[in-house]
Amino acid sequence: MLVDELGVKIVHAQHVPAPYLVQRMREIHERDENRQRHAQVDVQRRRDQPERGQHQHRRNRDADHHPDGRTLAGQIVAHPVSHRVRQPRPVAIADVLPRVGPRADCVVAHSLQGSPRRRERRRGQTAHQRLGRRSGNAIACPLYLENAAGPEPDTKRAEGRRFGAFGGGDLRWMADRVPRQGSGRRGLGSRSGAGVPQGADARGWRHTADGVPRVGQPAIRRGVPGFWCWLDHVLTGFGGRNAICAIEDGVEPRVAWWALCTDFDVPRSMGRRTPGG
């Protein structure tokens, strides 16, 4: 036969996959390869960043139920990276450090609007109630910490305890009254330079002894030795970024948590750059 002479083999009932099935299998194979490649890159990145292991070692070393061996400032500065998504950092810190509770008397600039009775009612709200509440492009942020084991009476706290507000619209934070106890300082004025403390210019740059400008000014020093509550606001393309930093005496300031004045999520890592920052 002609078929035998040409060496052509006839195969009966052979399955031929449809073209769309072949394309589908190729897509699945490429997806698996991409996942494997991304996993390898992530493993390599973890090896190249030893601070990830340091954070884990710190979590294992400093148990949450043994906070008495460190000062309050040390607990906040050495706080591990929050592993929660869409979780405000003050809430995460309050969960780890039960003896410390964030609280803000006057949080957002929008809370200064309305009738006096309404402002007083808003001022009585706690920071936990305001953290998830946004008004415009501003989000509530606590301005200081206090020891929950010895809280002050409400009557004493309500009078003369308004530390300030941070407005997302005009990027201004006010501190009209600051306690005079201890090493407390008067807070900042607006960006126009009114009320700026000594050593800072109208833009809010604070020049240290070595001449290096640093953004932010000390807002208030609480009764806890070595603890400073530091308010930074860095102008970005998306609005203002408000950071509360906790530092110990003689130690460079480190961010304890972030409070964003944008619509982005709160960063999960300590000191991570925000979008546009």
From Swiss-Prot:
**Region labeled Disordered — which residues?**
31-70, 113-133, 180-210
Q: Specify the domain of life of the species encoding this protein.
A: Bacteria
Q: What is any Pfam family matched here?
A: DUF3046
The annotated regions of Basic residues compositional bias extend over 116-133
Induction line: Expression is regulated by ClgR.
The record describes its quaternary structure and partners as: Interacts with Rv2743c.
This protein is called what? Putative envelope-preserving system protein Rv2742c
